[in-house]
Design a protein with these regions (language model features):
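C-terminal motif of bacterial Sec signal peptides marking the signal peptidase cleavage site
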Residues: 33-35
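Ser/Thr-rich, Pro/Gly/Ala-heavy low-complexity intrinsically disordered linkers and tails
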Residues: 41-115
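Loop and turn regions of beta-sandwich accessory domains that flank beta-strands and are enriched
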Residues: 507-694
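Active-site core segment of subtilase-fold serine proteases
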Residues: 115-265, 273, 281-314, 322, ...
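Solvent-exposed loop/turn segments at secondary-structure junctions
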Residues: 194-198, 252-254, 273-276, 300-304, ...
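Bacterial N-terminal signal peptides that target proteins for export
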Residues: 6-25
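C-terminal subdomain of the subtilisin-like protease fold in secreted/lumenal serine endopeptidases
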Residues: 123, 292-298, 332-333, 359-360, ...
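Extracellular S/T/G-rich loop segment that most often corresponds to the catalytic His/Ser-adjacent loop
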Residues: 193, 354-438, 442
Length: 694
């Protein structure tokens, strides 16, 4: 969902945040392809089947074998439907009125039936899915592929994999939450994505009524393509949502596959990305907010450097407000969003206005060694990270260790060891939130990020980027969760399921939407030039200089001290009036417009700018860093071009969580801006700041 209306910006809408490994050989295209890949790795690569007793479901053509099955895990399959993607009888046991996928049994791996089957996928799709067939007994037993799920329990090694650099304990600490009796029972999680294979053998026991199919015969058509209640994959590229669903809530103890973080939570699927329409995404974000608890969004704007505000921000904000104020009987639904995968090309999470809006839990990614995954975008909007793939070797980083990706469910009753990106980290946090809500169903949408931040686990402790703030949960009563630590790489740290559940149990709620205070917006008209200083490159860029220019800006962004205000530039201060009595900030929105030198148009190269916000406590949020941008050429390739979109752009800020608006008599919030690239200049026209909290 983007701010611009021309064809380039429109087609960049709603991209999944999983990095398709087959595309990563071209660094310049990484951020676009990472966002546009639609679902991930080559379907025939790194797929594994559960080593179970019995038969395996037939694959393409019904030959009984699965492409890319890991050595030693092949089963003997019975015939499938004889069509590519044919699904086995007995793969769904609908509940209720029989028209919706429901909480079914943990289905068989093979067998056949002569009973009539109803097609639930669109006839024009390459993959075919059916419902119906005989009910089968539940399987029991351990999940054989759980040993591959290092992100659940990291022992420092992985059987059958050649890995180095793994660090024991760099995981979700989920076993501690499970030991407290939390598995997600009674909590419903909606997967907003490209598709969800609700008939998957390791998902369908947790699929509950309420999924919705958004696929249409054409973008403007009113007719749904396929069954209205089955958001099924259409092609092999539509595997992203099914991988997300497995991370959240693959069924545990059924003798097959993997285990989700919340393995007894309910799942529904909304394939709202099928048509890349804003209206579908907005509808999905508030569909059944009276029944669903968590909405997982492993997607966002294309990771190509521009400032992408939501298309029709008023409608987007209104939609979120409905979910926050009306969902769960006024407690509010929980929205998780992926921070983005473009860091390797200089992209920055706060430049995607969709994932930094008020009420969103923005999720970054670490690796199995406990450091930032090199693609995971930094920002002042991050809440917590979760462990995901590293991909340093794939990205061409010399000397990097070989670290594992994420194991989860894949299409056609298969499993993959190659899920990655902030797409994989986000459903882990969604699963942890489900465990928290089971522990305390009265938690509001405001409570959840506070608990996540206070209970998060600090990683990369030797990094100089950490800053701390002490904010007692109960005044005068020191506690274990009083100190909040923030890092622009990691947000408040890595999500800690065990600690989050413990803190949730006796948490005193701060209330929902009706009790949250708002101060502002406080607007300042500046209309002054942004000075050039400490230039790292020069505009305009000749084609022969594009790669050197790109590298110079990325290196400049990496070298910045994110806890220092932008130096030698323009400063502008807002003094917050005494009528604003927020003592605990929960969210800040800074809206900013930069123009060209004469003020007649937008800034000619907004990626040149280093922009920061400093609080009365002295803490700094880096809103934007020098970075390159990409634009499409006539032949469809990408090239370096000027960064656009910094007009009335909303920066969402989480970094000042639990700080006061004022420190004694100091009520000044200072914006600083410096142009770090020589040659094209502009002005700061105006900016405003709005505070939310209590």
């Amino acid at each position: 969902m983007l701010h611009r209306t021309d064809s380039f910006w429109s087609r960049s809408v709603m991209k999944t945040r999983h990095l398709p490994v087959r595309h990563l050989a071209t660094p310049l295209l990484l951020s676009l392809l990472a966002a546009c890949g639609g679902g991930g790795a080559n379907p025939s690569a790194n797929l594994v089947s559960a080593p179970v007793n019995g038969t395996q479901a037939g694959g393409a053509g019904g030959n009984g074998s699965k492409p890319g099955v890991a050595p030693g895990t092949n089963g003997t399959g019975s015939a499938g439907s004889g069509q590519a993607g044919g699904h086995q009888p007995g793969s769904s046991n609908p509940a209720g009125n029989g028209s919706q996928p429901g909480a079914g049994t943990s289905g068989n791996h093979g067998g056949s039936s002569d009973s009539p089957r109803e097609r639930v996928s669109w006839a024009g799709c390459k993959l075919n899915y059916f419902r119906g067939g005989p009910a089968v007994a539940d399987r029991t037993g351990s999940d054989p592929n759980q040993t591959r799920q290092w992100y659940l329990t990291n022992t420092g090694s992985l059987p059958g994999f050649s890995t180095d650099g793994m660090v024991a304990g760099e995981d979700l600490r989920v076993q501690g939450a499970w030991d407290q009796g939390m598995r997600g029972e009674g909590i419903r999680i909606a997967v907003i994505d490209d598709a969800l294979e609700v008939t998957h053998e390791d998902l369908r026991a947790n699929v509950v009524a309420g999924s919705h199919n958004y696929r249409r015969l054409s973008p403007n058509a009113k007719t749904i393509a396929g069954h209205a209640d089955y958001p099924m994959p259409c092609t092999e590229d539509n595997d992203h949502g099914t991988q997300v669903g497995g991370v959240i809530a693959a069924r545990d103890g059924n003798g097959i596959g993997v285990s989700g973080v919340a393995p007894r939570a309910g799942l529904v699927g909304f394939n709202a990305l099928a048509n890349s329409l804003t209206e579908d995404a907005l509808d999905a974000l508030v569909r059944d907010i009276d029944r669903n608890h968590v909405y997982n969004n492993s997607w966002g704007a294309a990771d190509i450097g521009h400032f992408f505000a939501p298309d029709n921000k008023a409608a987007f904000d209104s939609t979120l407000n409905d979910g926050l104020s009306k969902g769960r009987d006024g407690l509010g639904v929980i929205y998780t969003f992926a921070a983005g995968n473009g860091a390797f090309d200089g992209d920055y999470s706060s430049m995607d206005g969709t994932v930094s809006a008020r009420g969103i839990v923005t999720v970054c990614a670490t690796n199995a060694a406990g450091t930032r995954a090199p693609y995971s975008e930094r920002g002042p909007n991050l809440t917590v990270c979760a462990p995901s793939a590293d991909l340093s070797r794939t990205l061409g980083i010399e000397g990097a260790p070989t670290l594992p990706d994420v194991s989860t469910t894949a299409l056609q009753n298969q499993y993959t060891d190659s899920f990655n990106g902030t797409s994989a980290a986000t459903p882990m946090v969604s699963g942890v939130v489900a465990l928290m809500l089971q522990a305390n169903p009265k938690l509001t949408w405001r409570d959840v990020p506070l608990i996540l931040a206070r209970s998060a686990r600090q990683v990369d402790a030797k990094s100089s980027g950490w800053r701390s703030h002490n904010s007692p949960i109960v005044e005068g009563q020191p506690g274990a969760y009083d100190t909040l630590r923030y890092h622009h790489d990691y947000g408040f740290g890595v999500v800690n399921a065990d600690a989050a559940v413990k803190l949730s149990r006796n948490w005193q709620s701060v209330g929902g939407s009706s009790t949250q205070k708002q101060c502002g917006p406080f607007t300042t008209r500046v209309n002054a030039p942004i000075p050039e200083a400490d230039a790292v490159a020069t505009n305009p860029v000749r084609k022969s200089q594009a790669e050197a220019f790109r590298k110079a800006l990325i290196e400049a962004g990496n070298r910045i001290d994110y806890n220092q205000a932008a130096a030698n530039g323009l400063t502008s201060t807002v003094s917050v009036p005494e009528s604003c009595q927020i003592t605990h900030i929960e969210h800040i929105e800074v809206t900013l417009t930069a123009s060209n030198a004469d003020g007649s148009d937008e800034h000619p190269s907004a990626g040149d700018l280093h922009i920061t916000l400093q609080s009365p406590l002295g803490s700094v949020s880096t809103l934007s860093v020098p970075h390159p941008c990409q634009l499409p050429t006539d032949n469809g390739s990408m090239q370096i071009g000027p960064c656009q979109g910094l007009q009335n752009y909303p920066f969402g800020v989480r970094r000042h969580l639990e700080e006061p608006v004022a420190q004694g008599s100091n009520r000044n919030w200072t914006l600083s801006a410096t142009d770090r690239v020589a040659g094209e200049t502009g002005r700061l026209k105006d900016w405003s700041i709005t505070f939310y909290g209590r």
